[in-house]
Regions:
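Extended, helix-rich architectural segments
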Residues: 1-152, 462-480
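A structural detector for beta-sheet-dominated domains
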Residues: 15, 20, 35-37, 142, ...
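Extended, charged amphipathic alpha-helical segments
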Residues: 218-349
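Amphipathic alpha-helix face/heptad-repeat signature
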Residues: 127-131, 256, 320-323, 327, ...
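Short, charged/polar micro-motifs that form catalytic or ligand-binding hotspots
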Residues: 129, 250, 310, 314-322, ...
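Extended, regular secondary-structure scaffolds
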Residues: 128, 132-239
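C-terminal helix-loop subdomains that flank or include functional centers
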Residues: 326-480
Length: 480
């Protein structure tokens, strides 16, 4: 599932925030420019309940429609969460294979023990999800005040509301809007918003906590007994490091998804009224009660009277149905055809790859950028643990369209290995690229298993086909 931020994230009400006042809640102009677009994208991937809770924001009232009629109109509408499905597919492609990590033993045990701790994988999935959705995300390293292990914090685009740089281009100010549940009694929790300011004061990195625009706490993170000189935060987007002012990547999908939703509302509205035939009678008095049913008689006193059902005819609904199909096809194309139901028959592997190459180019760039960010973050952590600042190396897989090696190719590969045409390392490499190995296994484990089985086969062959023993001449006992 794609990451969905906690309550409040992405629900920016610009009118309620300070755009230009000089306080901790002031919004950066770039944040203001993108806020409504980001809110729309977040709502679309959050699903039907969130979309419908915004009522007329995404589904305007029809002309002359009262509240009761609009409520029925809204309830009948169907929001097809294609945006969420697209994001889910993108994240699934990016996280199909686990990363390869080399790091000092203690760091491997603390942060990259994927058998017992999936925190790193969850962080990676969230980073891909946020950048693929909003074209912006942030991450920084945090050190607990109690002296525990350092950890990374991933922030969605909506959380960082203001920032500034020093003369060297490094961050000198980052303001984070934090939504959290505050304990007000033993049983009661209250949802509140506070601000965390990451800044440089007197040459040192500090965090200032604000509640209701009042600073309530200052924290100075210490590493190896010394304060940091830079803010350990990295901003990144779909094309590299830094803060982008470009629209969210899923904005086009979100716009068509909402248009699809409005067309669905009109179609269901029309079906509701046209799908229920209305009985009418002409040429008869309306003074008496009339009944419909096989056990009742209807008497029409006038010879010209007539009774019938008024039913819908025409092409009005067909045009709405066609519009839905067209918009769904547009969504499928924009979301890399992941939802395309077109019948193309059985395509060769190379044909499938070529058809998707351009569509995965953006995802490849996103993953490569995140790869750089993760190495930056975990090498900051490594340095704080007295390790070399380049002792951690994380490699994320970008072969999203890799297909499984066929049985024929695998047999030919093993024959080449047995015949001496390829060495063992080449064999293992091709088996791994061809997705014929357990992703949890290491190359050393696979090598040991192949050699073990090779020896077992050789021993079994010796037993089935024993080598003939040479005839030893028997001593001549008759000679003295």
């Amino acid at each position: 599932m794609p990451y969905v931020s906690p309550p409040g994230a992405g629900q920016t009400n610009i009118k309620s925030l300070n755009l230009y006042d000089d306080n901790i809640g002031t919004l950066h102009p770039t944040y203001v420019k993108l806020a409504l677009m980001r809110e729309k994208c977040r709502d679309v991937v959050s699903g039907q309940d969130i979309i419908k809770s915004k009522t007329t924001k995404y589904l305007p009232k029809l002309s002359g429609q009262d509240d009761a009629s609009y409520k029925n109109y809204l309830n009948r509408a169907l929001f097809f969460s294609i945006g969420a499905k697209s994001l889910q597919a993108i994240v699934g492609m990016a996280s199909l294979k686990r990363p390869k990590v080399t790091a000092p033993t203690d760091i491997m045990e603390k942060y990259f023990n994927f058998t017992e701790n999936l925190t790193f994988i969850e962080q990676y999935v969230r980073m891909v999800s946020e950048v693929s959705l909003q074209n912006q995300a942030y991450a920084y390293v945090e050190w607990p005040s109690n002296g525990g292990d350092a950890y990374t914090v991933i922030l969605p685009a909506e959380s960082v509301i203001n920032w500034d740089y020093d003369d060297n281009g490094d961050f000198s100010l980052v303001v984070i809007k934090e939504d959290y549940w505050k304990k007000v009694s033993r049983y009661k929790r209250e949802f509140v918003v506070r601000h965390r300011e990451l800044t440089i004061e007197n040459g040192n990195y500090v965090q200032n906590i604000f509640e209701n625009n009042v600073k309530v706490k200052t924290i100075t993170p210490m590493v190896l007994g010394q304060p940091l000189k830079k803010i350990p935060l990295v901003a990144f987007h779909s094309k590299g490091l830094g803060i982008s002012d470009e629209p969210p990547l899923l904005l086009d999908i979100a716009n068509i998804n909402i248009s699809h939703y409005m067309t669905s509302a009109d179609l269901e509205h029309g079906r509701h009224f046209t799908g229920l035939p209305t009985p009418i009678i002409t040429g008869a008095s309306s003074d008496n009660k009339l009944y419909i049913g096989s056990n009742q008689f209807i008497v029409l006193p006038d010879k010209n009277a007539n009774a019938k059902y008024l039913e819908f005819t025409g092409q009005g609904l067909a045009s709405l149905e066609k519009a839905l199909q067209e918009k769904q096809s547009m969504l499928a194309s924009l979301s890399a055809r992941l939802l395309d139901n077109s019948s193309k028959g059985s395509e060769a592997t190379d044909a499938v790859k070529l058809r998707y190459l351009s569509e995965t180019a953006s995802l490849t760039t996103v993953v490569k950028t995140i790869n750089v960010v993760l190495n930056m973050l975990y090498n900051i952590i490594a340095e704080s643990l007295r390790e070399s600042p380049k002792s951690v190396n994380i490699v994320l897989d970008t072969d999203f369209l890799g297909t499984q090696m066929s049985h024929t190719d695998m047999s030919a590969l093993f024959e080449a290995y047995i015949g001496g045409a390829v060495d063992l390392d080449t064999l293992i490499y091709n088996l791994r690229v061809g997705q014929r190995l357990n992703p949890e296994s290491t190359d050393e484990e696979v090598k040991a298993e192949i050699l073990k089985r090779k020896n077992e086969i050789a021993e079994a062959a010796k037993k089935e086909n024993p080598q003939p023993q040479p005839n030893n001449p028997q001593p001549n006992t008759s000679e003295k």
